[in-house]
């Protein structure tokens, strides 16, 4: 039983504080898990695509999908996890998630290879307002003025930083903005589709990867991406192979942690956790990335972004940790029953 499920079960006969605690812990831990996985995979992918010069981001994405399929399938066979067997209704239940999933995967890997780490992390923050907009339209959510102002601070900082980017790369900018759109849509639709009575967390992950690995392989072959991967001259380098396998495993962990964070939190909170993770990634990129060209305006914009993201996190966590009136909580539990 999940932490959220335990909370509901305890709420029927226990005290309100006890009912809230597991859900609160699950929210915080799932957000921390997602932030850690997101942080690690950006560093590993950056090393593969930039330091080693690996020319095939689509092939790397295929490796991450294959790792996801194998890990989940073996876990199901060993009865560690459960998700429904395939039937003809599953593609209809999932749509449009597989398309958003592969678009998010390919655009993310492509943009990582074409931009410096600090600029990549700044431009990825446009995922946040897009997620806010889509949650309002698709899920009918409403947010306070303080949260909206925090989001606008993130956007303002991103504009300032991007406007003074001394290593402007149009192709990289296009890929990262596509990645923002796909990430926002993927997060919102994942939240919508993740019904435990239907596919559940693991079913969404497994069937997404299954449906899109063959089309992605076809794209890789048709664009020459696969040929470049097979001709790459580092396949005898043990360190490179270990980093490639690590990236594949982290790709699975990132997908799982994203779904888990969206399950316990809102899609917007998941997007902002990714932005907070960028605090570490951006400053590490400035210090050791080797591809950041310093500009005062760029640096100021970067810090405005980070401040807005941290303020959003503070507001969101404060609202989650604030105890609800007992009467209101009982009403919520009655409705769930």
From Swiss-Prot:
Localization of this protein: Golgi apparatus membrane
Extracellular side: 49-53, 223-237, 289-292
Reaction equation(s) it catalyzes: UMP(out) + UDP-N-acetyl-alpha-D-glucosamine(in) = UMP(in) + UDP-N-acetyl-alpha-D-glucosamine(out); UMP(out) + UDP-alpha-D-glucose(in) = UMP(in) + UDP-alpha-D-glucose(out)
GO CC term, one of those recorded: Golgi membrane
Keyword flag Transmembrane helix: yes
Topology with respect to the bilayer: Multi-pass membrane protein
Main location: Golgi
Gene Ontology molecular function, alphabetical: antiporter activity; nucleotide-sugar transmembrane transporter activity; UDP-glucuronate transmembrane transporter activity; UDP-N-acetylgalactosamine transmembrane transporter activity; UDP-N-acetylglucosamine transmembrane transporter activity
Residue spans, topological domain Cytoplasmic: 1-27, 75-146, 189-201, 259-265, 316-337
Membrane-crossing segments per the record: 28-48, 54-74, 147-167, 168-188, 202-222, 238-258, 266-288, 293-315
Tissue and organ distribution: Highly expressed in heart, kidney, small intestine, placenta, lung and peripheral blood leukocyte. Weakly expressed in skeletal muscle and spleen. Not expressed in brain, colon and thymus.
Pfam families membership: TPT
Keywords of the record: Antiport, Golgi apparatus, Membrane, Sugar transport, Transmembrane, Transmembrane helix, Transport
Superkingdom per UniProt: Eukaryota
Function: Nucleotide sugar antiporter transporting UDP-N-acetylglucosamine (UDP-GlcNAc) and UDP-glucose (UDP-Glc) from the cytosol into the lumen of the Golgi in exchange of UMP. By supplying UDP-N-acetylglucosamine, a donor substrate to heparan sulfate synthases, probably takes part in the synthesis of these glycoconjugates.
PANTHER family: SOLUTE CARRIER FAMILY 35
Family statement: Belongs to the TPT transporter family. SLC35D subfamily.
The protein's name in its UniProt record: Nucleotide sugar transporter SLC35D2
Gene it is expressed from: SLC35D2
